[in-house]
C-alpha cells in the first residue's frame, strides 16, 4: 500500500518568525504524543537516512544541513572574502538539498510521515 506523507516548508526572511512557528509546531507535536526527530539534534557527521530513524512520526529538517555539503556551505558562507557568486552557491545548496531529499525526506513521505522543514527551495530562488 502506497502512503503519502505531509510536507510543510516554513520559509521567510531572516527575523520573520520561522523559528517561533517551528517551535510552536514542535511543542504541539509533543503535547499530541507524536514521536519527533529534529535534524538539529543529529550529531553524526553523515546526514541521517530514513531507514536508520524510521520510528518517528514527525521529522523537523532545515536547509542548509549541518552535515557534509551543508556544513561546507555554512563554513564558506561565513568567510569574509566571499569568493563565491550566487550561481555557485545555488549549485551547492542544490546538492545539499538533493542529498537530504533522497536520504531522508522522500523516504519519510513515502512511509506516510510528516516532514516540517525550515527553509526550502524558495529560499534559493529569492
Protein language model regions, located:
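Conserved lysine of the Walker
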Residues: 18
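Post-Walker A helix-loop "phosphate-sensing" segment adjacent to the P-loop in P-loop NTPases
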Residues: 27-54
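Phosphate-binding P-loop
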Residues: 1-5
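Hydrophobic anchor at the beta1->P-loop junction of P-loop NTPases
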Residues: 10
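ATP-dependent small-molecule kinase phosphotransfer cores
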Residues: 44-126
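Walker A (P-loop) phosphate-binding loop of P-loop NTPases
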Residues: 15
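Hydrophobic positions on the alpha1 helix immediately C-terminal to the Walker A/P-loop
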Residues: 21, 25
